[in-house]
Amino acid sequence: MMTFDIIIPTYKPGAELIALLNGILIQTSRPDNIFIINTEERFWKTEFETVLPVNVIHIKKSDFDHGATRKMGAELSKADVFICMTQDARPKDGRLFSNLLSPFNDEKVAIAYARQETDEKAGEIERFTREFNYPNKDRIKTSEDIKTMGIKAWFCSDVCAAYRKSVYNEAGGFVKRTVFNEDMLMAAKVMEMGFKVVYKSDARVIHYHEYSMKQQFCRNFDLGASHREYKEVFEKVSSYKEGGRLVKDTALHLLKAGKFYLIPKLVFHSAAKLIGYKLGKKYDKLPKSLVLKFCMNKDYFK
């Protein structure tokens, strides 16, 4: 029987972590271990440990990194597969893990990631964006798909993603330093090695963000900076085409839904994303004061 562990980085956890742990509690497949890498012990509450047995490792904020922190968790796991999750992801039903792990019966599958959905509180644009990025159809991706899918071939999200430990180790593990995109960098590596990345649409979590225009700018600045930092990977493909298709499809959806009044918001937010991304790709040429003003993850750029 396949063994699996869960790795959850946390920072100032609250009710959302309780919801996640309760969601794990009702799963038909239960993890062997739950490793929580918590940033700053003073923000941790012992009540989190009453829902399920968890292994908690506390780190300083200055030591947190999207790659290195998950790498630490992966090194703690001795299971066949480990699943990375974020503290604000919530299982949609009791079959999240059983559905997410089912592709690993194929030994060529290295990674499987879950579908992200919204709840009734989400706005129309965010809901459609999640449906665009996480459709109701499975997808098996290999290096052959890079020609037709571009950067989307490497798309993967550690909001909820499972990794075959043996292939992960063979690929060298997560990068130790990155503002984010450790998941896509790993997907690119395993595809280059000849393995598959699977999107499982029936493995579902509730996860979304209603970002302001400024937050969209800052998040995409970090995205651009990540693409610049690992240009040897990301320069192989273009991301502009995919972004343009999202804007076009969202606008058409809003018109068909009779919500044309949201189109100005879509335009302004999309412009903020594009400008942020382009500036992020030049982060190493900008004054540090501007980088710290533009970025979302300020500790990373200090």
What are these regions (language model features)?
Residues D222-A225, E229, K236-K302:
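Non-catalytic, C-terminal membrane-associated alpha-helical segments of glycosyltransferases
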Residues L21, D32-E41, I57-I59:
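Short beta-strand/loop segment that forms part of the nucleotide-sugar
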Residues R90, G94-R127:
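Conserved donor NDP-sugar-binding/catalytic core segment of glycosyltransferases
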Residues F82:
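Short aromatic/hydrophobic "clamp" motif used to bind/position activated sugar donors
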Residues S143-Y163, V179:
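A recurrent flexible, glycine/aromatic-enriched loop bordering the glycosyltransferase active site
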Residues F180-M186:
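Acidic donor-binding loop at a coil-to-helix junction in glycosyltransferase catalytic cores
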Residues P13-I26:
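Short, well-formed alpha-helical segments that are part of the catalytic scaffolds
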Residues K60-S77:
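Glycine-rich, basic loop-to-helix element that forms the pyrophosphate-binding segment
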